[in-house]
């Protein structure tokens, strides 16, 4: 997006058939993935119509090597607000998944609105344990942090022990209902452990009435209000 490209986030758990559907339907020209997926696609000669570059968890790979050699790639490209920034595919509950085109203005206005509504500022520290191939973890959480100059603890996944370790240094947790169900099942969830957390956010799916009631009657209840 920084370089004017259109970004298509994809679940790394997709099968080859699913992956190829999204790549071909979106007419993608470049796939950035891990070495394992790259090797598998190339060995089966499925890498037709697009270039494959690799990147690993340590941020190194063929794409990072090329970026290091091409310093000019770091320079941002000016875009118009109505230019497409990303394509997000629907869940496909009523048929084959369809790509929704998200404009630069969509991302900016959403981040501005949520930053103001949630009162984010540079003093906030967000616990981020959401998948970044969904809009919640990728655009909602990340863009709000960038716009407000806040900080975040970027975790690979949601693990209770890790979350509790970060609570004392955090002011916000963004999660999904299952996060809060697991937190409520733990005896570690107390007023003391979450005393610095000013905001708990649940998205992606409805938070049931039962879970809401449990949150408000838990040992950490004062912090949810």
Regions found by a protein language model. Give the residues of each.
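Conserved S/T- and glycine-rich ATP-binding loop of Class I adenylate-forming
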Residues: 31, 84, 90-93, 126, ...
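Conserved AMP-binding A3 loop
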Residues: 85-112, 223
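Conserved AMP-binding/adenylation subdomain of ANL enzymes
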Residues: 108-125, 133-172, 186-188
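Conserved pre-ATP/AMP-binding loop-to-beta segment of ANL
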Residues: 70-89, 95-96, 119-125
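Conserved helix-loop-beta element of the AMP-binding
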Residues: 27-29, 46-56, 126-127, 171-175, ...
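Structural core segment of the AMP-binding/adenylate-forming
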Residues: 2-66
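Single conserved hydrophobic/aromatic residue that forms the stacking wall/gate
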Residues: 216-225
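Conserved G/P- and acidic residue-centered "switch" motifs that form tight phosphate/ATP-binding loops
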Residues: 4, 93, 149, 204
């Amino acid at each position: 997006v920084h370089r004017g490209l259109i970004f298509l986030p994809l679940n790394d758990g997709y099968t080859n058939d699913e992956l190829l559907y999204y790549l071909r339907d979106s007419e993608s020209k470049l796939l950035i993935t891990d070495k394992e997926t790259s090797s598998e696609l190339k060995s089966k000669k499925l890498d037709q119509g697009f270039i494959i570059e690799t990147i690993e968890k340590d941020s190194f790979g063929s794409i990072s090597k090329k970026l290091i050699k091409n310093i000019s790639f770091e320079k941002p490209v000016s875009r118009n607000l109505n230019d497409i920034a990303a394509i997000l595919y629907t869940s496909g509950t009523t048929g084959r998944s369809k790509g929704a085109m998200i404009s630069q203005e969509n991302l900016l206005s959403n981040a501005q609105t949520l930053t103001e509504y949630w009162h984010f500022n540079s003093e906030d520290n967000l616990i981020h344990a959401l998948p970044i191939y969904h809009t919640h973890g990728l655009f909602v959480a990340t863009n709000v942090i960038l716009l407000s100059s806040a900080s975040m603890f970027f975790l690979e996944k949601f693990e209770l022990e890790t979350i509790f370790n970060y609570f004392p240094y955090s002011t916000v947790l963004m999660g999904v209902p299952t996060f809060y169900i697991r937190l409520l099942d733990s005896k570690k969830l107390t007023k003391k452990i979450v005393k610095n957390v000013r905001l708990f956010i649940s998205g992606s799916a409805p938070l049931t009435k039962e879970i809401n009631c449990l949150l408000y009657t838990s040992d950490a209840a004062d912090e949810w209000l």
